[in-house]
Design a protein with these regions (language model features):
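Class I S-adenosyl-L-methionine-dependent methyltransferase catalytic core
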Residues: 1-177
Length: 177
């Protein structure tokens, strides 16, 4: 996802699906496959920039950040509602303000549907788009089906249509490690 200086926010989504026969963890947690980052960098070479300040708000076990570091040398700030490793700061993304701190927000977010009392995926995407620096990018690993729905159209795509969408032709599984 990109946000230009005219405050016209648009985004790019890298689609993936989870049809793994392996067990899934609680908290809507899927361990990302590190190959997902390599595929993203092939399409989005601007990520190879050590000066980028990158946030991973749904870090899980840090698979995406570890893979990005191996390939580019870029480090990410890691947050998750459940801390699964020492360098992940345990926090609820919705309870912290990250406005204008990051050039890139990159994550495989939980796919939960929100409610009146609990924010969901659409709310999370809107928060990321509003918080990324002007000229920054939001990169999400999502199932293609998340492009659908009237709610997401009204909350996100109507005013912030996707800039680029990359879809895997071969599945990369996300699973319990």
């Amino acid at each position: 996802m990109s946000k230009n200086s005219e405050d016209n926010k648009v985004f790019s989504t890298l689609g993936s699906s989870n049809h793994s026969i392996k067990e899934r963890q609680n908290e809507d947690y899927y361990a990302s496959d590190e190959r997902a980052i390599a595929h993203l960098i092939i399409k989005e070479s601007w990520l190879v920039n050590p000066d980028l300040k990158i946030l991973e708000p749904c870090a899980g076990e840090g698979v995406l950040s570890d893979a990005l570091y191996k390939i580019t040398g870029n480090k990410m700030d890691l947050y998750d509602i459940v801390s699964r490793r020492n360098d992940v700061i345990q926090t609820n993304y919705f309870e912290k303000d990250f406005s204008n701190q990051y050039d890139v927000i990159l994550t495989n977010p939980p796919y939960e549907k929100g409610s009146k009392t609990k924010p969901g995926l659409a709310d999370m995407i809107v928060k990321m788009l509003n918080e990324v620096k002007d000229g920054g990018h939001v990169c999400l690993f999502l199932k293609v089906l998340h492009l659908e729905s009237q709610e997401r159209y009204e909350k996100i795509f109507k005013n912030m249509p996707p800039q680029r969408i990359h879809v895997y032709s071969k599945r990369i599984s996300c699973y319990k490690k």
